[in-house]
Amino acid sequence: MQSSGETDILATIGTRGSALALAQANEVRDRLARAHQVAPERIVIKTIRTSGDAIQDRPLFDVGGKGLFTKEIEEALLAGSIDFAVHSSKDVPTFLPDATWLPAFLPREDVRDAFISPRAASLNDLPAGSIVGTASLRRQAMVLRLRPDLKVSVIRGNVETRLRKLVAGEADATLLALAGLNRLGLQDRATRILETDEFLPAVGQGAIAIESRRDDDRINAFVKAIGDSETEVALSAERSFLALLDGSCRTPIGGHCRVNGDRIHFRGLIISPDGTQSYETTREGARADAAALGADAARELRERAGEKFFTLFAGA
């Protein structure tokens, strides 16, 4: 939407309607307003209900995996009813529609997972047989790898809903992204923060992605003003890794890239849903080679695990 006046709408953001999604969209809007020295009100936020929001009774890996939180928003983007979308990067499929791309990522929040429990100080302190509630296959697998004597049950819903279910006794503990708690001002709910060496995060965790139409030069220039180059490099490696390893919610995958000047350090993991089999690799290389480094790490794990690993657990 081209504008000329000081009160005209400059852009319309599409986002999910959860408190976390709106917090992320508002952060993008405020950063854009500061970068372009305009009133935040000139950037409108439009909420869009997605398939992932509508399905609350099953784990996402049973109903299509990745894309459930972005499909309807992408449809609005392609139809022109919004100018760009704001997503949690870990929800964005590795393969986008041909007409869209990710021109910018905000500076990354904390990538770690948080352990939350009213009954134990840590995952190790939970009594045998305790129930850990999560809808994430990665978190399920990593919990069972560390504590095979625990039980995992499905807890779906937004951050606040999952915390309410925990208080109501539907589980003894749950795991949530620390970034989401931070953005909602709920970081004090974290019982313990899980370090990445024991609990590798999801690809893209903690990063906010902007998706726009490739041919919309005005909007692309508009949003690139708030893009963070380090996050873009890290996500290039992580998403390249994910793309070669299925990248759906049916495959428990962890991946994290750290950027240090012109060098990057990548760690990747594939794991069976029951936590009994896992393959891990690390890579170091040049920042400019991020995508190739992530792809190389994925090829190594595919070769080491063998195709049987992926077919065996595809329906798990």
From Swiss-Prot:
<dbReference type="InterPro" id="IPR000860">
    <property type="entry name" value="HemC"/>
</dbReference>
<dbReference type="Pfam" id="PF03900">
    <property type="entry name" value="Porphobil_deamC"/>
</dbReference>
<protein>
    <recommendedName>
        <fullName>Porphobilinogen deaminase</fullName>
        <ecNumber>2.5.1.61</ecNumber>
    </recommendedName>
</protein>
<dbReference type="InterPro" id="IPR022418">
    <property type="entry name" value="Porphobilinogen_deaminase_C"/>
</dbReference>
<comment type="similarity">
    <text>Belongs to the HMBS family.</text>
</comment>
<dbReference type="InterPro" id="IPR036803">
    <property type="entry name" value="Porphobilinogen_deaminase_C_sf"/>
</dbReference>
<dbReference type="InterPro" id="IPR022417">
    <property type="entry name" value="Porphobilin_deaminase_N"/>
</dbReference>
<feature type="modified residue" description="S-(dipyrrolylmethanemethyl)cysteine">
    <location>
        <position position="249"/>
    </location>
</feature>
<comment type="pathway">
    <text>Porphyrin-containing compound metabolism; protoporphyrin-IX biosynthesis; coproporphyrinogen-III from 5-aminolevulinate: step 2/4.</text>
</comment>
<dbReference type="Pfam" id="PF01379">
    <property type="entry name" value="Porphobil_deam"/>
</dbReference>
<comment type="subunit">
    <text>Monomer.</text>
</comment>
<comment type="function">
    <text>Tetrapolymerization of the monopyrrole PBG into the hydroxymethylbilane pre-uroporphyrinogen in several discrete steps.</text>
</comment>
<dbReference type="InterPro" id="IPR022419">
    <property type="entry name" value="Porphobilin_deaminase_cofac_BS"/>
</dbReference>
<dbReference type="GO" id="GO:0005737">
    <property type="term" value="C:cytoplasm"/>
</dbReference>
<keyword id="KW-0627">Porphyrin biosynthesis</keyword>
<dbReference type="GO" id="GO:0006782">
    <property type="term" value="P:protoporphyrinogen IX biosynthetic process"/>
</dbReference>
<keyword id="KW-0808">Transferase</keyword>
<dbReference type="GO" id="GO:0004418">
    <property type="term" value="F:hydroxymethylbilane synthase activity"/>
</dbReference>
